[in-house]
Amino acid sequence: MDNYTYSELLKSLQNKCDNIALIIKPEKIKQELERIEKEQEDPNFWQDVLKARDTNKEKVRLNRLLETYQKTKNSLDESVELFELAQNDNDEVTLSLLYEEAPILENSVQKVEIEIMLSGENDASNAIITIQPGAGGTESQDWASILYRMYLRWAERRGFKSEILDYQDGEEAGIKGVAFIIKGENAYGYLKNENGVHRLVRISPFDANAKRHTSFASVQISPELDDDIDIEIDEKDVRYDYYRSSGAGGQHVNKTESAVRITHFPTGIVVQCQNDRSQHKNKASALKMLKSKLYELELEKQQSSAKNEEKSEIGWGHQIRSYVLAPYQQVKDARSNTAYSNVEAILDGDIDAILEGVLIAKA
């Protein structure tokens, strides 16, 4: 890097920071935080528990956004000042240090951009994830289980919790399907763009001839809705099926029909839950899954209508990412058009760079 390149980078980052300030309005955030703090001083604040909880969540979000922005702006201002001084004094040591720290500065500004992108209506929600293998039997079922582990490892890395709703073992290996919740701040915001088909190319561990195979799995993401969001479901539009639960990994087989499957006729959506030994609890969880999927479907329709587009098909034609393990190693995302070589780390849950890249590409 030279002086001109670094100078242009600083101009670009300053421009981004100015645009961020226009969007988030730091002074208005400070005023809103003051208003919330006064509201919390009211003795009656905790009488409405749900409202108090939402207010606290908003306070945490605003504080984090303001702190992230302020820290980034201060670092940028300091770098601009140091750069000018180092140029005037012909201080090669300081210039070299600034060049080395340039990627950190870029990343800091990007983090603020991502904070803004995660301020949508449901972005702070938990995420309900459903993974279904495509055609191909054992190959695709094994691939679905690899994706399942990838998301679980991502959740662990972030300190998020996960809860299985439905799990069906594969015939020889892998899974026939899984539905689970990842619980953590902005879980849905980060994962919402994972909707679509994920493609794997590898030398099959199940093929004695060690041939290269291509497998597909579908991932669907929806927000876990708060109880205060009302989604009406007409009973005549659904069918309930009850069956015996096998449990994750084939353990704890129930002798009673506690597992629940719900089919929604107007949309064709099918959800099922066998997480609990109680049929009543499984039915409640399955209904929550159905409501979340219907809510997500309605949002997609509204967004497509607003953009005057046809709704993109989340099906076997909507491939969002390829994971190639042979003859070379690469993960490539179709939305950000970015390729990554750290395939092993990605499949072990190191997907933040991919998720953030897609958020920025779709901004």
From Swiss-Prot:
Superkingdom field: Bacteria
InterPro entries with a match to the protein in the record: PCRF, Pep_chain_release_fac_I, Pep_chain_release_fac_I_sf, PrfB
Post-translational modification: Methylated by PrmC. Methylation increases the termination efficiency of RF2.
Known role: Peptide chain release factor 2 directs the termination of translation in response to the peptide chain termination codons UGA and UAA.
Underlying gene: prfB
First-listed, main subcellular location of the protein, grouped into a coarse class: cytoplasm
Compartments reported by the entry: Cytoplasm
Recorded family membership: Belongs to the prokaryotic/mitochondrial release factor family.
Name assigned to this protein: Peptide chain release factor 2
Keywords of the record: Cytoplasm, Methylation, Protein biosynthesis
